[in-house]
UniProtKB/Swiss-Prot annotation:
The keyword Nucleotide-binding does not apply. This is Recombination protein RecR. Belongs to the RecR family. It comes from the Bacteria. A zinc finger (C4-type) spans 60-75. It comes from Prochlorococcus marinus (strain MIT 9215).
Length: 201
């Protein structure tokens, strides 16, 4: 078997792309070769965009969605139902639900799922801030939109018990296999999942 050898700078670039989620060696090579074909001005604009995003994008102080301001556009939108909160694990899940165009409330991004195997406990997630947010506001319903997995179920049950004294807690219905990621679910399935949510109280 002949091993492919790259010049050191190219090998380094490919190595960086391979660190991206979902990017294998072949895709990393394709991306690196594409980058090398671009004019220097394009590469400079790209690198500046990366640095700007890394420096200026942070978390919304209210829901922990990604934003470049104190509050994200969704939280600031007065047309959204502020009394209806959908809890998601990551911003990518929020974006998936927004693509479905079914949910008209606001969100709370907890930043992951409870996973003892990975040493991720409730204290490492934005669960306490969620409880504080709900306890200090008039919330009609909390919708848990967490991945259908052991970790997702554990997190949903944990949050459900904490929030039950304050408001109605539901979980979206799933028409997908255990372990499926929300970001890969089509818009129609997500819309139906929201409509068919079940009560956890």
């Amino acid at each position: 078997m002949i091993l492919i050898t790259y010049t050191k700078p190219l090998s380094k670039l490919i190595g960086h792309f391979e660190k991206f989620p979902g990017i294998g060696p072949r895709t990393a090579q394709r991306l690196a070769l594409f980058i090398l074909k671009q004019p220097e001005s394009t590469i400079r604009d790209f690198s500046e965009a990366l640095l700007e995003a890394h420096s200026n994008v942070g978390r919304c102080k209210k829901c922990f969605n990604l934003t470049s301001e104190d509050e994200c556009e969704i939280c600031k939108n007065t047309q959204r139902n502020q009394k209806l909160i959908c809890v998601v694990a990551e911003t990518k899940d929020l974006l998936a639900l927004e693509r479905a165009r079914e949910f008209k409330g606001v969100y709370h991004v907890i930043g992951g799922l409870i996973s003892p195997m990975d040493s991720v406990g409730p204290e490492l997630l934005e669960i306490r801030s969620l409880v504080e947010r709900v306890s200090k506001s008039e919330i009609d319903e909390i919708i848990l939109a967490l991945t259908p997995s052991v970790e997702g179920d554990t997190t949903s049950l944990y949050i459900g018990k904490l929030l039950a004294p304050f408001t109605k807690v539901t979980r979206i219905a799933y028409g997908l296999p255990m372990g499926s990621e929300l970001e890969y679910v089509d818009e129609v399935t997500l819309a139906r999942a929201l409509e068919g949510r079940t009560n956890l109280n």
